[in-house]
Structures are given as structure tokens and as C-alpha cells.
A protein has these predicted regions:
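Chalcogenol-based redox active-site neighborhoods
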Residues: 1-180
Length: 180
């Protein structure tokens, strides 16, 4: 698995970006240069139409404006197709108005390059990456497939990384950093 300090791999994936009936607006090509110069929060879930996954995705959606205020683009994805993403978004009330792209890694290239493809299940692990504007991975977290992650904690870590200071345990934006 790629870790902190590694370069985030190049990619080009289809994404579901809208639930409109106009198929030209429902999908987009997203690649590593789509959000050049921005922080990126890239997270993966195992499968669409499951139970834990929509709780996390909706939570990231609710915090999207907080991430945007920090000049960070949220990108979520799984190994499902963009069409499955769109069907799920249309079917699930909490996902209809997601403000970020749902990446479709159907060939499993990005999840393999990152080292977060669960070989046994053939799906993405529940992984989260914070990537800086230079495309360097600054944070990685992987949860068991059965346990959802905490998007608020991802936001807290992003805040800490953006200080370029030493942040103690349980530090939150606005708290003092360590002076050494």
C-alpha cells in the first residue's frame, strides 16, 4: 500500500457527478490533474448498494463545504461503474445530492496502484487518502470492511496538515500547536 510521502498515482476514471436525466451532464472524466494545485481527500468504499458505505458517503457530503473552505476537493470511489453509482444515487435518498464526484475504478487500476484492493473480496478497501497540492500523500487510513470511518476526523487531520506545525493529540483547528 502506498503511504505517507509517496506520490499519488496518475489516473483517469469516469465519475458520476450528477443524477440528472441528461446523460451528458451525469458523468465526467476525472484525472489526477482535474484538481491540480488543490488538496484532495480521496476515499474508497467496498461496494454500492450496501449498508455501511452510504453512511460514510453521506457524512462526507455533509462536510463537503468544510473541505471546500480548506481548498480541498473530496473524491469518493469504488470498483463499481459510473452507471451503478448513478443508479445508487437515484435510489438512495442520502446520496441524491452528493456534491462530489463518485469515481468508477472498474478496471481496479487506481485501487491496485494504491494497494487498497482487497484481493479476497475483489473490492476496494475502506481507505482514505489526504493528498497535498503537489500530489504527495500526507495521510492514509484503512478501516476493516465492516467498520465505517469518521469524516470529521479526516477534516481534523487536514486542518492539522495545513498548519505545517506540530499538532498534539486531539488537536483541533483554532487550538495552539506545539512550539519546540
Amino acid at each position: 500500500m502506498l503511504g505517507v510521502g509517496d506520490k499519488f498515482p496518475e489516473f483517469k476514471l469516469k465519475a458520476c457527478v450528477d443524477t440528472t436525466k441528461d446523460m451528458d451532464k451525469a458523468f465526467a472524466d476525472i484525472d489526477n490533474s482535474s484538481y491540480s494545485g488543490k488538496w484532495k481527500v480521496v476515499f474508497f468504499w467496498p461496494m454500492d448498494f450496501t449498508f455501511v458505505c452510504p453512511t460514510e458517503i453521506a457524512a462526507f457530503g455533509k462536510l463537503n463545504s468544510e473541505f471546500a473552505d480548506r481548498d480541498a476537493q473530496v473524491l469518493g470511489g469504488s470498483t463499481d461503474s459510473e452507471f451503478v453509482h448513478r443508479a445508487w444515487r437515484n435510489d438512495h435518498e442520502d446520496l441524491k445530492d452528493l456534491p462530489f464526484p463518485m469515481l468508477a475504478d472498474v478496471k481496479r487500476d487506481l485501487t491496485s496502484d494504491l494497494g487498497v484492493l482487497d484481493r479476497g473480496a475483489g473490492v476496494a478497501q475502506r481507505a482514505t487518502f489526504i493528498v497535498d497540492p503537489d500530489d504527495v500523500i500526507r495521510f492514509v487510513s484503512v478501516n476493516d470492511l465492516s467498520v465505517g470511518r469518521n469524516p470529521q476526523e479526516v477534516l481534523r487531520v487536514l486542518d492539522g496538515l495545513q498548519t505545517d506545525e506540530l499538532c498534539p493529540c486531539n488537536w483541533e483547528k483554532g487550538d495552539e500547536t506545539l512550539n519546540v
